[in-house]
A protein has these predicted regions:
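DUTPase catalytic domain/fold
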Residues: 1-212
Length: 212
């Protein structure tokens, strides 16, 4: 089964931008709020489309949804994860299936997302869990491409997705003990550095005392 290229013109039309042009039984996905530059660039590989960081995200330790305005960024601490809502809203026909994979350029920085799927018939924005497996804090700006979407053809007999699209909802409120543990996890690097600094200071003072 081959990958369907992202094309906005016949005879390989696979992407449309308006509800009027979308056909539920067709073979073109509807992408609203698209990055047109990706789709119009003749030198860009059109086997994938890079989904972008949208205007909402949620830290996996936090029970509130956080807004992300133009020019702002998400700071991903080492070992941390966030659920990012995509800038794009999609609507899939019954003839296409979507697969979401990490971007190689971000993997080199330790940033990876959970591989996800988009069923035929799905309509809505996408929520992508993204991790920082690296050792440094990394930033993802609003409208940065952070994961890659692949299109795959679907054979006859498929039962389309028939449920509301995804949206951010608050997580259950954690206990005081869990919040304390989360606080320690987030600041683990700084706490480790602080202990190391105090230890070194103690050693230096001891050496100075001996030399005197």
């Amino acid at each position: 089964m081959g990958v369907v290229p992202f094309s906005t013109s016949p005879p390989y039309l696979s992407v449309v931008f308006t509800q009027e042009d979308f056909k539920p039984d067709g073979s073109a996905v509807l992408i609203m709020n698209p990055d047109v530059r990706q789709l119009d660039d003749p030198k860009s590989c059109n086997a994938t489309y890079d989904l972008r960081v949208g205007d909402k995200f949620k830290d996996h330790r936090n029970d509130t949804i956080q807004a992300l305005n133009e020019g702002e960024c998400i700071e991903l601490l080492p070992g941390n994860a966030v659920i990012i809502q995509t800038e794009e809203e999609v609507r899939f026909p019954r003839r296409l299936f979507g697969q979401i994979l990490p971007r190689v350029s971000l993997l080199a920085l330790g940033i990876a997302n959970t591989p996800s799927k988009i069923d035929p018939g799905y309509s809505g924005r996408l929520l992508i869990t993204t991790f920082n497996h690296g050792k440094r804090t990394e930033k993802l700006r609003r409208k940065d491409g952070f994961c890659s979407l692949h299109l795959l053809p679907v054979e006859d007999g498929v039962i389309p997705f028939n449920a509301p699209g995804k949206q951010h909802t608050g997580l259950p409120r954690s206990s005081p003990l869990q919040r304390w543990r989360d606080w320690l996890e987030v600041r683990q690097i700084w706490l480790t550095f602080g202990v190391f600094a105090l230890t070194m200071a103690s050693v230096i003072l001891s050496v100075v005392a001996i030399l005197r």
